Amino acid sequence: MDKQEAKHINMPSPSACEYKSVEAYLFIDPLCKDCWEIEPFIIKLWLEYGKYFSIRHIVTGKVDGTNASSHKWNKPANIRFVWEKTTSLHGFSYDGKVHMQEASSTPYLVSMAIKAAELQGRKAGSKFLRKLQEYIFLENVSNPDCELLLACAKDSDIDVEEFKKDLYSASAKKAFQCDLKFTNEMHITEIPSLVFFHANSDEEGIKIAGTYSYDVYVQLLKELVKCEIEPEPLPSLEVLLEATQFISSKEVAFIYDCSKQEIERELKKLQLKRKVQMIDVKCERYWKWIAKEKDLV
């Protein structure tokens, strides 16, 4: 647990390596469990190497198979494919447009909600997405409706009235259309997929489809940065819980590279201090921060 000694996240000034020199795009379907389970990888990568890259979630938006067109590649994607699985577990097809006949469907409404939340900032969008996924996968909500989306907005501490206005707005619709177009251009055929680009280079990007070991993502980041990069110390357990608000023992153990037993001993100490609440859901133990929220970044 040595890595937990750092009390705050202090990003040092850039030296030989360019600050935020890599742009990462995580292509997701919010209703896909695999896209939820990759989040601990992204959190850990951001905590350790966040000074080298920025990240943005791209909502893919599945199209019903009976209405979906075949792929129409508008232009060749300047991207290199690595370790892409030969069989897609979540196959779907795009033509880069929002299908308005799907406007009342759950996938469309959920995608619009994420874009509406993002209009209040990228952090707001990420918080909303995580809260939405908790409802879907922990409380078995298969068809999120408007009422639940508003509850997610409230729980995410974003401006609910602004969210209501944006949910069916032209701005949210345009943002979703841009995500679909970008998904099409990047030839995304499996979710989750992570695409890396160097921000100041015309070199090809790198795409990895599916979920792999954490070391693979670090290796790809190092390849793009093109200089020796070192991980930052991880924040204290309290800082992590304060930022995520709700997280499982399994996720925390992965982030700190410790056993669940060791992590839960530390978490129970926080429970005794009345800083977290233990919640058992579906044979997994979760921890809810019950003090005031504080952002990691």
UniProtKB/Swiss-Prot annotation:
GO terms for cellular component: cytoplasm
InterPro entries, alphabetized: Adapter_SpxH (IPR046404), Thioredoxin-like_sf (IPR036249)
Keywords: Cytoplasm
Entry keyword annotation includes Cytoplasm: yes
Compartments (UniProt record): Cytoplasm
Keyword Cytoplasm on entry: yes
Function: Adapter protein required for efficient degradation of Spx by ClpXP under non-stress conditions. Interaction with Spx stabilizes Spx and exposes the C-terminus of Spx for recognition and proteolysis by ClpXP.
Family to which the UniProt record says this protein belongs: Belongs to the SpxH family.
Subunit structure: Interacts with Spx.
Protein name: ClpXP adapter protein SpxH
Organism whose genome encodes this protein: Bacillus anthracis
Source taxonomy: Bacteria, Bacillati, Bacillota, Bacilli, Bacillales
Gene: spxH
